[in-house]
């Protein structure tokens, strides 16, 4: 009998896992044993002679796969944040194993008959609101995943799901390996003219760590790539970096083009097998947007304002570049560089001026102080919690009255084995165990921030501070839920609602009241100067049209892939992509491919859902207006958001939750108003 105790240790706070006692080589065996245990328990539920009730069916089923959930949550946490080649190989085996198990349960006619019986009698069962939502979610989970199909179609669905379970981790791994394979080695410091000293120091230390003597090493990790593209005067070097970044997993040994064609084809087949015309139709049925027509109309509305603003932004940058010695047509590797120079000229502001005021620890403390002031929750470092890497810090999260809310694991810097980007993960949702005890959430926030150097602490860019607040907002959604059922607690909400708490948090970062809480010079302790905040605020809508237009184009690309009703015509990924975004191409096409590294939609759960970021931006812009109207830290407004949005998870439809908070629907113009894109 396998001992699963390391995944939930009795002697640790909140039964946290002990990563030090979990051996990489045991995952496969542990998952097989956990699946066997779960199967036996599901058989007991299935073969019960008792009339179905919520307790003996829904609750009983929720408790069948406890060990499997524990092992998988740890495995997938590490697969993203602390992976190895062996784990990537395991993922190719684990995906089909868990897919087969899920389908064995989801397609079992006897199990579904019990769920269906409860659904038919739902109004006579005396269920409370939460139980009704859980029953509905369970019934839809079965029906939307093939429970009503005939045997032959069920077999076909199994084949599709097995293949998809292999392809998504393969796509993600290819993107990671392709990015990691690139290095730009510079041996002449004169070639780095324009680059800030802190970026050069970091590149020097990276080179030393990689045994490149007397050199500077630049990679495609964001803390290296973005400063390089923003400040390096050498246009040829910028071009090299841009071409590498824009060609991740494209026409190299980690190429993702075949994976994309397979994923898209299988998603179409799956949707049509389940009675939908397209994958987007299938996905959007369970979203606030409801259908593609609504998404299309939403994007068209944004496009109407973003397009002319983007053209204006491009014209302004082009004129400025020509005025200052640039000759010719701007290329993609020129935009960030010249836009930064134009911002400096127009606002006398360089975001690098902010960096000394954003040492990482102060920013962490600031995010925590912000949450305490806004929502009445306190985060405190806690010792003795085993972590999966020395970079990871743990915090206990409590209400001000001492009520425990959960544990937060924070992991901030790039390293080999960690994928790019930033994300919030869940090691355990808030839930109720088989003994009826509430289990509190274990949540992680994982990022790839600028590293400390030998001489300075990690000093963040403003974008990185926004990312910290964003991911912490997701974490608060998980930690502050009051729902004791994992299926509807925390971030278990519609995908186009889940970004509201995270994006809302970013709004405070241009407010003096918030910045003065934590933005202090790492050497002198001086609070960030008022003049610098004013410059930040004055420049916050700089290039907003360009940025929004870019986001709309990515949404259109996502929808182009997922509104197909046949994959027969997709012979060439890049040709399909070019056609899909041709109307959004304002700069000359210079090669590369977005789709091959677009992990959000091919490996990250945002297929037919990338629009969710913009959809939620309308919500967060409107929600923040409630705080500007009532006071940035108005206790009543903060508590109302906590109790109507964060606490309730997916226990009610998101539109209902938002109306309860705001007293009305979100104003569709709120995003354009905030970004300065509404016509006067």
Report residues per predicted region.
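N-terminal helix-rich structural modules
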Residues: 1-195, 627
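C-terminal, non-catalytic "cap/extension" segments appended to globular domains
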Residues: 2-23, 29, 33, 215-217, ...
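Short His/Asp/Glu-rich catalytic/ion-coordination signatures at enzyme active sites or charged loops
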Residues: 11-26, 75-94, 118-159, 219-258, ...
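Intrinsically disordered or highly flexible coil/loop and linker segments, enriched in small
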Residues: 36, 40, 44-51, 67-84, ...
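Short, hydrophobic/amphipathic alpha-helical patches that form generic packing surfaces
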Residues: 67-77, 136, 140, 336-343, ...
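Active-site-proximal, well-structured secondary-structure segments within enzyme catalytic domains
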Residues: 129-130, 134-135, 163-166, 173, ...
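Short, hydrophobic/aliphatic alpha-helical segments
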Residues: 257-268, 439-445, 483, 648-650
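Short pre-active-site segment immediately N-terminal to the catalytic Zn-binding motif
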Residues: 450-468
């Amino acid at each position: 009998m396998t001992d699963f105790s390391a995944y939930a240790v009795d002697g640790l706070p909140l039964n946290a896992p002990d990563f030090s006692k979990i051996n990489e080589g045991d995952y496969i065996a542990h998952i097989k044993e956990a699946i066997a245990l779960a199967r036996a328990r599901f058989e007991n539920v299935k073969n019960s002679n008792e009339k179905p009730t919520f307790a003996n069916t829904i609750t009983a089923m929720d408790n069948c796969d406890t060990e499997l959930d524990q092992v998988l949550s740890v495995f997938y946490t590490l697969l993203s944040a602390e992976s190895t080649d062996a784990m990537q190989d395991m993922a190719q085996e684990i995906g089909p194993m868990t897919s087969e198990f899920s389908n064995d349960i989801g397609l079992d006619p006897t199990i579904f008959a019990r769920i269906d019986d409860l659904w038919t009698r739902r109004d006579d069962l005396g269920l409370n609101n939460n139980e009704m939502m859980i029953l509905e979610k369970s019934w839809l989970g079965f029906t939307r995943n093939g429970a009503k199909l005939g045997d032959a179609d069920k077999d076909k669905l199994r084949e599709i799901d097995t293949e998809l379970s292999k392809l998504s981790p393969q796509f993600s791994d290819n993107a990671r390996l392709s990015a990691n394979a690139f290095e730009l080695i510079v041996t002449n410091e004169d070639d780095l003219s324009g680059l800030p000293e802190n970026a050069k120091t970091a590149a020097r230390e990276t080179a030393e760590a990689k045994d490149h003597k007397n050199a500077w090493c630049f990679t495609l990790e964001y803390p290296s790539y973005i400063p390089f593209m923003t400040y390096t005067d050498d246009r040829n070097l910028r071009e090299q970096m841009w071409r590498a970044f824009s060609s991740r997993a494209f026409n190299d040994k980690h190429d993702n083009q075949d994976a994309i064609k397979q994923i898209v084809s299988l998603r179409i087949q799956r949707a049509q097998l389940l009675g939908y015309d397209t994958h987007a139709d299938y996905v959007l049925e369970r979203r606030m947007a409801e259908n593609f027509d609504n998404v299309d109309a939403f994007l068209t509305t944004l496009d109407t304002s973003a397009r002319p603003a983007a053209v204006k932004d491009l014209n302004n940058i082009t004129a400025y570049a020509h005025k200052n010695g640039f000759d010719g047509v701007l290329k993609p590797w020129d935009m960030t560089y010249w836009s930064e120079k134009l911002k400096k000229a127009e606002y006398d502001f360089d975001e690098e001026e902010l960096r000394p005021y954003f040492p990482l620890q102060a920013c962490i403390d600031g995010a925590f102080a912000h949450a305490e002031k806004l929502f009445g929750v306190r985060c405190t470092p806690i010792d003795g919690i085993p972590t999966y890497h020395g970079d990871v810090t743990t915090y206990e999260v409590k209400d001000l009255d001492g009520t425990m809310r959960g544990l937060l694991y924070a992991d901030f810097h790039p390293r080999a084995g960690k994928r790019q980007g930033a994300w919030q993960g869940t090691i355990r949702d808030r839930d109720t165990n088989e003994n009826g005890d509430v289990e509190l959430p274990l949540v992680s926030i994982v990022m790839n921030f600028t590293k400390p150097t030998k001489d300075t602490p990690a000093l963040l860019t403003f974008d990185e501070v926004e990312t910290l607040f964003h991911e912490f907002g997701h974490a608060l959604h998980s930690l502050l839920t009051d729902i004791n059922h994992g299926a509807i607690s925390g971030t278990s909400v519609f995908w186009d609602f889940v970004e509201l708490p995270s994006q809302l948090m970013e709004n405070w970062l241009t407010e003096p009241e918030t910045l003065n809480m934590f933005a202090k010079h790492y050497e002198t302790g001086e609070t960030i100067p008022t003049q610098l905040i004013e410059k930040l605020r004055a420049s916050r809508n700089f290039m907003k049209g360009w940025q929004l237009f870019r986001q709309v184009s990515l949404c259109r690309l996502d929808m182009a892939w997922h509104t197909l009703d046949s994959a027969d015509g997709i012979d060439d990924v890049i040709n399909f992509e070019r056609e899909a975004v041709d109307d959004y191409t304002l700069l000359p096409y210079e090669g590369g491919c977005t789709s091959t590294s677009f992990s959000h939609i091919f490996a990250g759960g945002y297929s037919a859902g990338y629009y969710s970021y913009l959809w939620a931006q309308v919500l967060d812009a409107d929600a923040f207006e409630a705080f500007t109207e009532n006071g940035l830290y108005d206790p009543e407004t903060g508590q109302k958001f906590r109790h109507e949005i964060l606490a309730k998870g997916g226990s009610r439809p998101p539109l209902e939750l938002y109306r309860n908070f705001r007293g009305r629907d979100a104003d569709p113009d709120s995003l354009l108003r905030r970004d300065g894109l509404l016509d006067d």
